[in-house]
């Protein structure tokens, strides 16, 4: 795997990752995102419906926590997760945890990390971890690490222990990797831990960079708001310690404003769980991300973001409110609201996704109220395509030297 940077602007890195995949013929532009999946399948979508989406990332994101309990089945199959999931030509990145599902804390030890699947807790030693990777056969995988510590709320002693454990796990995994010929083509991604302690973050980054890893995961930064400068400064400090020629990953950061903050601090790759979370709320992404809008559509886009279209509309009534609505962002509209019952326009004017070309807000509202499975399918198609096009706009803005203009455009939609 090789990362070639073509431009660095305001900390943001534009480039291409090449020479990866089983045949070494795949490429991935950065900044970019991965295709989020549940047990190696895009949520709500079949392989055929996935093909209708434009700009699908070259790398599919699978999670060990959702697949570990199926290890025996995959061992008997003996062909790896790619063929098992019907995606034989896909490139897979395997993370330890699902970024959507919070993990209970207090269960990691010096010998094992606890994963949480549908059947409960699974203790994962380094031996079991490498055994699972041999069965899954991903192209990239995150190293086992003690990632319970996040910025805020942990003692210095616990944070130091997290870094120490993670480095021990990394060394053990590297040793085990060298003993298994079938894992030689796989790329190990080292995890940078350290909570909110700058010295521990830097120690973790420096020590991990000394090992033969193919990239770095900045772990434990999910849930940090875009305006939290103290925490964001940790990201800048960590990326400054990492080699320029290896990609930097992050999990659980998906809001457009947060993505741009992290990109401008040197992060390259994100997961795409955010559009899935938006879909689960019965919402559709409608934010504008064109930093150089066509004058003919500028008035239309302005209308899209008018007061009556925003989530914060005081008069908006949701027919069946639920707890998820508290998580809504200014970048989406909730199609459960009564005002969409007779709105026969597309989810987003100008969007070329299958849903917007063929169906209306009123129809999706009806599907949500009737609890039809098609609602999730149509929303997932739209939200994935809009999110993937957002990253395309980020790369275009970097090429044009307009990344700050794009960040300002996104910031205005968050105000």
Curated annotation (Swiss-Prot):
GO terms for molecular function: metal ion binding; protein heterodimerization activity; protein homodimerization activity; tRNA binding; tRNA-guanosine(34) queuine transglycosylase activity. Its main location: cytoplasm. Binds 1 zinc ion per subunit. Gene3D superfamilies: Queuine tRNA-ribosyltransferase-like. This is Queuine tRNA-ribosyltransferase accessory subunit 2. The keyword Transmembrane does not apply. It holds the Pfam family TGT. It is found in: Cytoplasm; Mitochondrion outer membrane. It comes from the Eukaryota. Signal peptide: none annotated. Belongs to the queuine tRNA-ribosyltransferase family. QTRT2 subfamily. GO terms for cellular component: cytoplasm; mitochondrial outer membrane; mitochondrion. InterPro entries: QTRTD1, Queuine_tRNA-ribosyltrfase, TGT-like_sf, tRNA_ribo_trans-like. It is a peripheral membrane protein. Its cofactor is Zn(2+). Zn(2+) binds at residues 351, 353, 356, 382. Heterodimer of a catalytic subunit qtrt1 and an accessory subunit qtrt2. It comes from Xenopus laevis (African clawed frog). Keywords: Cytoplasm, Membrane, Metal-binding, Mitochondrion, Mitochondrion outer membrane, tRNA processing, Zinc. Non-catalytic subunit of the queuine tRNA-ribosyltransferase (TGT) that catalyzes the base-exchange of a guanine (G) residue with queuine (Q) at position 34 (anticodon wobble position) in tRNAs with GU(N) anticodons (tRNA-Asp, -Asn, -His and -Tyr), resulting in the hypermodified nucleoside queuosine (7-(((4,5-cis-dihydroxy-2-cyclopenten-1-yl)amino)methyl)-7-deazaguanosine). The keyword Lipid biosynthesis does not apply. GO terms for biological process: tRNA-guanine transglycosylation.
């Amino acid at each position: 795997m090789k990362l070639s940077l073509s431009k660095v602007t305001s900390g943001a890195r534009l480039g291409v990752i090449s020479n990866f995949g089983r045949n070494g013929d795949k490429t991935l532009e950065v900044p970019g995102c991965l295709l989020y999946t549940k047990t190696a399948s895009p949520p709500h979508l079949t392989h055929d419906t996935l093909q209708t989406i434009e700009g699908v990332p070259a790398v599919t994101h699978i999670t060990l926590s959702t697949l570990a309990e199926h290890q025996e089945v995959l061992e008997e199959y003996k062909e790896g997760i790619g063929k098992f999931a019907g995606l034989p030509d896909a490139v897979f990145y395997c993370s330890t945890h699902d970024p959507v599902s919070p993990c209970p804390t207090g269960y990691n030890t010096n010998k094992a990390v606890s994963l949480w699947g549908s059947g409960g807790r699974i203790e994962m030693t380094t031996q079991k971890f490498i055994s699972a990777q041999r069965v899954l056969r991903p192209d990239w995988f995150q190293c086992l690490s003690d990632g319970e510590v996040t910025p805020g709320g942990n003692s210095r002693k616990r944070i130091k222990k997290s870094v120490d454990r993670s480095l021990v796990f990394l060394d053990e995994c590297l040793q085990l990797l060298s003993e298994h010929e079938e894992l030689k083509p796989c790329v190990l991604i080292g995890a940078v831990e350290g909570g909110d302690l700058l010295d521990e973050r830097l120690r973790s980054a420096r020590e991990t960079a000394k090992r033969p890893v193919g990239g770095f995961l900045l772990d434990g930064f999910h849930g940090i708001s875009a305006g939290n400068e103290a925490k964001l400064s940790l990201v800048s400090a960590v990326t400054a310690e990492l080699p320029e020629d290896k990609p930097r990953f992050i999990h659980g950061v998906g809001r457009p404003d947060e993505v741009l903050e992290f990109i401008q601090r040197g992060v390259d790759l994100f997961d795409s769980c955010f559009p899935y979370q938006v879909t689960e709320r019965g919402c559709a992404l409608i934010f504008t991300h064109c930093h150089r809008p066509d004058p003919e559509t500028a008035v239309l886009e302005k209308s899209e973001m008018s007061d009556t279209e925003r989530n914060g509309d005081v008069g908006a009534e949701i027919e069946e409110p639920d707890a998820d609505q508290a998580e809504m962002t200014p970048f989406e509209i909730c199609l459960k609201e009564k005002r969409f019952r007779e709105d026969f326009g597309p989810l987003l004017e100008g969007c070329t996704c299958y849903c917007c070309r063929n169906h209306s807000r009123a129809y999706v509202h009806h599907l949500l109220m009737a609890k039809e499975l098609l609602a999730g399918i149509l929303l997932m198609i739209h939200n994935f395509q809009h999110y993937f096009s957002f990253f395309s706009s980020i790369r275009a803005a970097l090429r044009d030297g307009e990344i700050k203009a794009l960040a300002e455009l996104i910031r205005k939609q968050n105000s």
